[in-house]
Amino acid sequence: MNGRADFREPNAQVSRPIPDIGGGYIPTEEEWRLFAECHEECFWFRSVPLAATSMLITQGLISKGILSSHPKYGSIPKLLFACIVGYFAGKLSYVKTCQEKFKKLENSPLGEALRSGELRRSSPPGHYTQKPKFDSNVSGQSSFGTSPAADNIEKEALPRYEPIPFSASMNESTPTGITDHIAQGPEPNLEESPKRKGVTYEELRSKNRESYGVTLPHKTDPSVRPMQERVPKKEVKVNKYGDTWDE
């Protein structure tokens, strides 16, 4: 042990580092030879045939009147354009074949880069990602034995976990730490409820009459008026001095 704990999972697949191929990369002799071979084959087997075919097709379309020729230069501009298009189309079509040749080339950084890129595209995500190394290098050099100070730091950093009793997990009404319960009011006293008397409709009606009679002025029933009000008064005569007499 050298004071550093380095844990790795067994059978972990670690990808080989991809060679750095930038703008200043200098190809090897084998790569230069393969470049020249690809250029020659691309020119004779792809660019020339496609350029000639494009020019023949363009000339046939001009002869049939489908394409119009230039009034001064005739069909030369369109034939040149068809030749250029066919030439570059042939070069693009040979790129895949040239890449396959470089992949088969041994001891070639360029071929290794092409193979690694193809494997990364074809493999599922995370297949070639390196497994994290568990280095206990947080507080300087560490070994399998940890100090009490490091244990205290780890305990403070980690969140505290309070286990819930088994009986609480079986009870659905026990709160689980989430404040989603609904506050309930105080339960009614069950002992006082039987003591209350039931109020009938007649009692309520009589109480309403009493309260209504207090708020209104007292009115007497015409049938209970005194008898003297019902008896018509006798007509009396009054003299000029205010004296009255009956006839």
Swiss-Prot record:
Residues 136-146, 168-177 have a biased composition (Polar residues). It is found in: Endosome. InterPro entries: OCAD1/2, OCIA_dom. Keywords: Endosome, Phosphoprotein. Residues 192-210, 218-230 have a biased composition (Basic and acidic residues). The modification Phosphoserine is found at residues 108, 116, 123, 193. The keyword GTP-binding does not apply. Residues 113-153, 167-230 are annotated as: Disordered. GO terms for cellular component: endosome; mitochondrion. Residues 1-112 form the OCIA domain. Induction: Expression is down-regulated as differentiation proceeds in stem cells. Expressed at high levels in the brain and at lower levels in the heart, ovary, testis and kidney. Expression is strongest in embryonic stem cells and in the blood vessels. 'Asrij' stands for 'blood' in Sanskrit as this protein is strongly expressed in blood vessels. The OCIA domain is necessary and sufficient for endosomal localization. Belongs to the OCIAD1 family. This is OCIA domain-containing protein 1. The gene is Ociad1.
